[in-house]
Amino acid sequence: VKTTTNLATLGMAVVLCGPTIGAARAEDWAQFRGPGGHGRSTTSGPVAWSRDENIVWKAELPGAGASTPIVVGDRIYLTSYSGYAVPKEEPGDLDQLVRHLLCVDLKTGKLLWDKQVEARLPEPERIRDHGYAANSVVADSQRVFAFFGKSGVFAFDHSGRQLWHAEVGDGTNGWGTAASPVLFGNAVIVNASVESQSLVALDQKTGKEVWRAKGMRESWSTPLLVPVGDETELVVPVFEKILGFDPQTGKQLWSCNTDIRWYMVPSLVADDGVVYCVGGRSGGALAVRAGGRGDVTDSHRLWTGRKGSNVSSPVYHDGHLYWAHEATGAVYCAEAKSGEIVYEQRLERAGQIYASALLADGKVYYLTRDGRTFVVAAKPDYELVGVNELRDGFTFNASPAAAANRLLIRSDRFLYCVGK
């Protein structure tokens, strides 16, 4: 059954009530790239769909955005922006820029609430490609946290009531802001590289600053929490390096040279204490074992490679890494142990791919900017399982999310629930 909802027309008239949010479930897609930030789902995913087939519901959004939908219980949270640069061809007045935090019912696609946040100006007048709502939100059973760059970090409860607001810097960049917050202990941690070249931890209850680590140069990546024995490290790629921190204190523990020039956008993945990086403007990849101290380039860096991606993040599965090049439409499989490229396959008429890869039920999903999803078997031998189109005339920059054996895919105009 397919339903279409216009969220923009529902607006603030929607009552702020709904089901109580229970304890967060392990399968909840409660942050950017889902559980652990690895882009891996424990549920199965659909294989075939189109604009008219296997669409559970389709909801029109009140604005554009590149943030990934997240899911907690039976609620979806995502951000968008309106008032300026929508459409891009007639941008209008920057003073009218508004950001939205949206809460949508997972089962029906109906809007439960829309919290509007005024932008702290000035912002770059034309953030290329992805606009003003690229940071995905993060949530637990009590709160929802949204990061809007220089406008700050906002905490809401699940009824949409704002709890606090904290600023983490006033810097801007022509590419805007994109890193998503993560939760650790009682803190919400943001990569404020654009805003203050800092990594900032805020108290989840009050928004007060817990710690701040400097040196976050030219990084748009979402931090990754990596288990190392009985401890946990917070790992982030920056200009020419990967840095490891103690998430309790913000103390830098180690650094590893990447030999990758210029800025970092893709986020990291890890398995069994090994961190994998695929990214950088100049391209490249590497693996480094977490848990070291000081400069670990010689002692813990396991391999480097020349193939990478400037935008989309990889997934790890069964000893292999899978990712897409953002510009060429090529997808890669590499052996995680050695970095050796197993295959490089160009997807037919793929165009640009900004969304990060998603793994579900032994399949890797690659979503292109024009709304085509290539489903590829997650195995060393390349096998194209299917190609599915949702072209709606708008851009698909956001990474897909998985929930209840379905996919959530958003464009700059619509949010789709794909499945049966």
Question: Residues of each region from the PLM?
Answer:
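N-terminal secretory signal peptides that target proteins for export/translocation
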Residues: V1-L7
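Noncatalytic, solvent-exposed loop/strand surfaces
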Residues: G22-K420
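N-terminal regions of proteins, emphasizing targeting and processing segments when present
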Residues: T5, G18-P19, R25
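Bacterial N-terminal signal peptides
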Residues: T9-T20
